Amino acid sequence: MPLPAGTTSEKYMNALDRVLDKLVEFKPEFLILSMGFDANIADPLAQFELKSEDFYEITKRTLTATKDFTQGKVISILEGGYDLNALAESANEHVNALIEFNWLIFSAL
């Protein structure tokens, strides 16, 4: 769902909820999360105003909405993030949400 530059956390979460409603209708058997942390407001390429803790909420909402269908079948891929501090904080929030669902399994390819 395209969002304009300057999108705030609140507007992003509202859009995410609409996307998740459609995802639940689809009933996916697994998820591939392509997590781009360059949406963090501290990122030099950011055009959104997301905070690091927003990535916890994004992950939690997504996992909660789809848990009955995916049953923990989730792949998370790091996509972007160019401010190292913001990247570390945002990725930590994302991983914390995965851990909370007991779905975190580390595997090296």
Language model segments and positions:
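A general "terminal functional-core" signal
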Residues: 1-109
